[in-house]
C-alpha cells in the first residue's frame, strides 16, 4: 500500500499532509503541479519522492494522480492499493489499514472512503459549507458519481479503466467513479475517520469559483457519460432559462414577471426544511439554502465555460485558492 499526495501552492498545509502519511506507515510520492512556493523543496526536505509535472502540458488533478500512480508502481511494483490525498488534507493514521481490510474482504470493491472532516469549520461560512457538504452516511455508495478526491483505490481496478481522465479540469473523480461503476465495481464508505480537510476559504469569490468548477464538472459528466442530467437541467433552468424569461417578460407583463423570482424563495425554503429535518441546526439549514440558490447561477457559468472550452479545444484548471 502507498499514497499519492498531490498539490499546487499548498504552503504551510503541505508539511502536515506529508507527515500524516508517514504517521500512517505508508510509502508515498508527492506530485507537484507547477507550484510557485516552496512545496517541491519541502517534499525533498522530508525525503518524500517528488514528481514535478511538465508545464508544457495543461495541469489537472487527474494527470497528477495518474503520474503519482505510475511513480509508485515504478518504485514499488507490488503495490496493490493506493491512497489518494490532496495536499490540503491530513490522513487519519488508522484509515489505510481499515480501508485495506475492506478491499481484501470485498473483491468487487474498487474504492473505499471514510468520513472527511473540515479542520476549521467555524473559521468562515464557506468552510462551514464545506463541512456540511462532507457529511454523508457510511455504507455501499449507490451513486458512483459522488466520488471525491480522497480515497483508497484498488490498483488493478484503477488500471482496468485507464485511471483518471487527464483532460478533465473538474469532476475527474466522478468521471472515474462512473467508469468504475460501468465496469462492475462498487464503492464502500466505511464508518471511520478518513482525513481532515483545510478549505482555507474566506471570501465569496473563492466560493463562487469553486461552484463554477462544480458546474463545469456537471457539464463534463453529462457530455461524457450522460450522467447528472437532472442536476444539469436544474442549472440550465434556474441559472439561465428562468432569469432570461423574467427579464424578457418584464415589459410585456408590466413587471408582473418579477413575481417569478418567488420560485427561488420556494426552492430555498425546501432546501432549508430538508436540512432541518436531517438534524441540522436552523442556522446551518439557512446557510445551505441561501448558497444553494446562489450555486444555480455559478453552475450555469460553469456549464457555459465548459461549452466554450470544448469549442476552443482547450481546458485549464480552475483554482479557488
Language model regions located:
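Short, well-formed alpha-helical segments that are part of the catalytic scaffolds
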Residues: 6-24
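A conserved acidic beta->alpha catalytic loop
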Residues: 20, 32-41, 55, 89-90
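Glycine-rich, basic loop-to-helix element that forms the pyrophosphate-binding segment
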Residues: 55-74
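Short beta-strand-to-loop acidic/aromatic patch adjacent to the donor-nucleotide binding site
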Residues: 76-90
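A recurrent flexible, glycine/aromatic-enriched loop bordering the glycosyltransferase active site
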Residues: 118-119, 135-153, 169, 175, ...
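Catalytic donor/gating beta->alpha subdomain of glycosyltransferases that bind UDP-sugars
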Residues: 165-228
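Membrane-embedded multi-pass helical conduit in multi-pass membrane proteins
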Residues: 239-311
Amino acid at each position: 500500500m502507498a499514497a499519492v499526495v498531490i498539490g499546487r501552492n499548498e504552503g504551510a498545509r503541505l508539511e502536515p499532509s506529508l507527515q500524516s502519511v508517514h504517521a500512517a506507515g505508508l510509502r508515498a510520492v508527492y506530485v507537484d503541479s507547477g507550484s510557485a512556493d516552496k512545496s517541491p523543496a519541502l517534499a525533498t526536505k522530508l525525503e518524500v519522492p517528488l514528481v514535478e509535472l511538465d508545464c508544457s502540458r495543461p495541469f489537472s488533478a487527474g494527470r497528477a494522480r495518474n503520474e503519482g500512480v505510475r511513480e509508485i508502481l515504478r518504485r514499488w511494483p507490488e503495490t496493490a492499493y493506493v491512497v489518494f490525498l490532496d495536499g490540503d488534507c491530513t490522513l487519519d493514521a488508522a484509515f489505510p489499514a481499515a480501508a485495506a481490510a475492506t478491499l481484501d474482504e470485498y473483491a468487487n470493491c474498487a474504492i473505499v472512503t471514510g468520513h472527511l472532516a473540515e479542520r476549521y469549520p467555524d473559521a468562515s461560512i464557506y468552510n462551514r459549507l464545506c463541512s456540511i457538504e462532507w457529511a454523508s452516511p457510511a455504507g455501499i455508495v449507490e451513486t458512483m458519481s459522488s466520488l471525491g478526491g480522497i480515497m483508497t483505490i484498488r490498483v488493478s481496478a484503477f488500471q482496468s479503466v485507464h485511471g483518471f481522465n487527464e483532460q478533465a479540469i473538474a469532476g475527474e473523480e466522478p468521471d472515474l467513479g462512473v467508469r468504475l461503476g460501468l465496469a462492475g465495481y462498487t464503492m464502500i464508505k466505511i464508518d471511520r475517520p478518513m482525513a481532515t480537510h483545510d478549505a482555507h476559504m474566506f471570501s465569496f469569490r473563492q466560493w463562487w469559483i469553486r461552484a463554477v468548477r462544480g458546474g463545469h464538472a456537471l457539464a463534463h459528466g453529462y457530455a461524457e457519460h450522460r450522467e447528472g442530467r437532472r442536476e444539469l437541467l436544474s442549472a440550465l433552468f434556474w441559472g439561465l432559462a428562468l432569469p432570461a424569461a423574467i427579464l424578457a417578460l418584464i415589459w410585456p407583463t408590466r413587471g408582473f414577471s418579477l413575481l417569478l423570482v418567488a420560485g427561488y424563495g420556494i426552492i430555498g425554503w425546501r432546501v432549508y426544511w430538508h436540512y432541518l429535518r436531517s438534524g441540522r441546526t436552523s442556522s446551518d439549514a439557512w446557510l445551505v439554502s441561501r448558497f444553494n440558490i446562489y450555486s444555480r447561477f455559478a453552475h450555469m457559468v460553469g456549464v457555459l465555460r465548459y461549452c466554450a472550452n470544448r469549442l476552443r479545444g482547450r481546458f485549464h484548471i480552475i483554482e479557488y485558492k
